[in-house]
Structures are given as C-alpha cells and as structure tokens.
C-alpha cells in the first residue's frame, strides 16, 4: 500500500496508471529498491546461510545430476552436522560429491527422488536398510514441487498408471536382514475422458537450497544453460529459499524480461566461495570409443541404424541414453529433428569438441552436449509439460523387458538393482507420443526379453508401439499383440520364435531388417 501511495503521489493529476507513467524521481527508485531488498538477506558464510535447518528438516536440493547443484550449501549442511534430513532431489549425484556427501556422513533419513544414477553408495545404504527411498517419476516430482509453490494441494496425472506408483508396494525401506519394512501407498485413481489418472499430492519443504548463476542486489536470479532444471520450481516451493550464485550484480543489470526467478521467491542469497562444477559424464565428439566397448558391437550398430529410420522431418523427439542417443548421429542433414532432453533443453546438438565443453550444458544422461541455433533452455516443470501434454511425436528408450501387449519394464530389479524410473514413466504416458523400444533380443544369460507378461516392475502399461532388436522389428498392437515385420538376414522366423517368450503374428509383407544409409 505504501508503494501504491507513493506511485499515486508521483503521478500528475489526470494521468491514468494504465498509461506509461513518467519517470519516477530517483529518490523513489532508491526507496523501492531498498524496501524490497530488505527482505532478501545476503550472506558470505555458507553455514550461516543455512541457519535454521535442523534435525528432521525437509530440504529441497536443486540441480540435475551434478549440473546446477548448490555445492557450497551442501557442504555447509555437512559442516553443520544436522541429521535425519528428508531430502527432495531430482537424483542423487555421485558417491563423493553433491548429495553423496550427506549420504556418506549418514545425515539423511529419507530421499525423495526419481533416479539414483551411478550413486552406488545410495543404493547400498537403501538395500541395507539404512536409508528410506521414495522413488517418484521425474515429471510427477517436478509437478508436485511446482504445485507446492503455487498453492495447489494435489493434481491428477496419467503418469504411473498400471505400475507400482499406482498400485503401491514399491519398497521404501528395507530391514538390515533384507525384508521389507515400509512400502509405498496406492494412489487414488479417477477416469477422465476414457483415461485413468493418479492423484498426486504437492510437496513443500522447510528449505530449498538453490544454485543460480547471478543474482542482483534485490534478489532476482538468473540461471545459465541447463542448470535451470529443478532449481526454478524448488525455489518457489519452500518456506525459506537459499540461493547460491557465482556473481552478485547491481539492480538494473538484468532486463526485467530476462529474470528467471523474481525476488519474491528468494529469502537468502550467497555468493559461493568456490565452485568445482564437476562433470559427471564428460563426452566429446572428438574422443574415440575404447577398444572392446559396446560402441564397436556390430549388433548394437545394427539396432542404431534401424532406429534412425524412425526420425521424420520436423519431428520433436526425446531420446534415452545409449542406443537412442547414438541413433541421432544418423539423422540426415536434409532433415530437421528437434531433440528434447527432459532436464530442460529443446534443440540438442552434437557432443561438444574438447574446447567447447560446458559443465552447465548437459543432457538427461549427464553427458556434456551442445545446443543448436534456435535451441532453448527451460525448467524441469516446463519440460515435463511438453512431455505429458503430447507435444513430442517420438520417444525412444531402452528396456529390460517388453510384454506382447506393449507393457514396458526398464527401471528396477527388486532387491538387486535400483536405478529409478527417471523420466521414463512420464515419457510413455502420453497417447500422442509414439514409443519405440531399442534393446538386445535376449539377456546376457540368453533369456528372452520379449515376454507374455513382464516379471519386473512396470514403467508403463500397454505403451510400446515398436520394438527394435538386433534380430527383428515388431509392431505392437495393444489389444492384439505383436507382429513381426522385419527380420535380420542372419535370422529366421524359427529363431525368433525360439528366443521370444510369447506368441506373435508374422506380417504377410515380412521384409529384411532395414538400415539407414549414411548418405540418406
């Protein structure tokens, strides 16, 4: 009200507030800035910046992998020694950096995340009963956080229907002897326009620890590259948001339209004393695969070259790590395909040269990447709005198992292997997006991966549209089952029957397995 009175006083009589006002006196500008910055506190000591975090607090940690993590504030939590923390994070980084530091010091009671990645310590603590782990689809996690920041208590999403997320029973806590103590609860389900949706509840935290690029002296924040990720929605969803930045600049340095998080969401700012900005998976296009690596496997190359035929000019596509990403190397230069990465990039380019590597520009597989001209960055909640909203024409990903009706399992082996679903459940949840699975036909122990019914926890139910292996290509009808449409020249229909654990039809137009031509 005081600001409105000042504005009314400054406007000449008869001048509408709807019209562009004359410039305000400089003393008023100073008054406005000093009034607002008084509610944003600036710190030089990271430990003091996290004052108020106590045993049992719920803390959101921004970032994706190691990109955009608040490394100085995480270090401050370790120094502070608080314990029994409930951490909300997109994933858990690595053993000795990021969230891994707090796990190693046994300060965390529960982690709410979507993906463990390569953090063997987290997986070990979880399976040993020393850590509670609440796995949530990445897009659902982003939306739960966004809802928490906007005052929306709950929402419905198609993600996770027909999986453990909906049914409940996903292991949250094991006992030291290996038996289950805590399981996830089933979700409420409602039908809208012939589709089933799960009720998900918003998440809020006591504290959000955020990594920005720059902040001005009134607390407005901007981010760099793909480091926007979960930082933006988390900054809005906590009682106290603490932002560490690389630089603090004067008010007015940022154009108003360039500000990513307005100061109304920011409580504390600190310029980080130092930044390691470690890269989890340094990948360059001028590095050659090691001898004996999978990249030199002829069977793998065969799948890649067949998968590349699924791209169409003008398509928006999301590619999983491994074979799907490698298939993009074969996109024709005559064709434009907009590659989406769920951590917040549209317009992925090739891997960088060594002198182009940027820790703030990574893909969903934590690899260093480039962005093509016309590409853009955005936050994780926007990214999954694109996914769930059906704005992608294609998603291509790997699998542990696929059923004859298109059920997909690719995120968990109970009691043995826990990686998490990441964004996969969201990617296969849109009916408008074609789902292509690329995988080897059998496991390393020669067990079929195409089954009558998946035995592992599902990622999605009746969602796969096409299966590509080194032996064959199957089209999937969600009510009728599989049809063999392409066969590698070294295989036979009898061979496919012997290595596929379900029935399938054979197309009357069965043809040799197609391969993209390098000059196509």
Swiss-Prot record:
- Tell me, in one coarse class, where this protein mainly resides: mitochondrion
Q: What are the GO cellular component annotations?
A: mitochondrion
Q: Where is this region: Disordered?
A: 280-299
- Enzyme Commission (EC) number: 2.8.3.5
Q: Which UniProt keywords apply?
A: Mitochondrion, Transferase, Transit peptide
- Statement: the UniProt record of this protein carries the keyword Iron: no
Q: Describe the reaction catalysed, as an equation.
A: a 3-oxo acid + succinyl-CoA = a 3-oxoacyl-CoA + succinate
Q: Where is the transit peptide?
A: 1-39
Any one GO biological process: ketone body metabolic process
The main enzyme category here is transferase
Which Gene Ontology MF annotations are present? succinyl-CoA:3-oxo-acid CoA-transferase activity
The UniProt subunit note reads as follows: Homodimer.
Q: What does this protein do?
A: Key enzyme for ketone body catabolism. Transfers the CoA moiety from succinate to acetoacetate. Formation of the enzyme-CoA intermediate proceeds via an unstable anhydride species formed between the carboxylate groups of the enzyme and substrate. Probably play and important roles in the energy metabolism of spermatozoa.
User: What family does this chain come from, according to its entry?
Assistant: Belongs to the 3-oxoacid CoA-transferase family.
Write down what this protein is called: Succinyl-CoA:3-ketoacid coenzyme A transferase 2A, mitochondrial
Which gene is this protein's source? Oxct2a
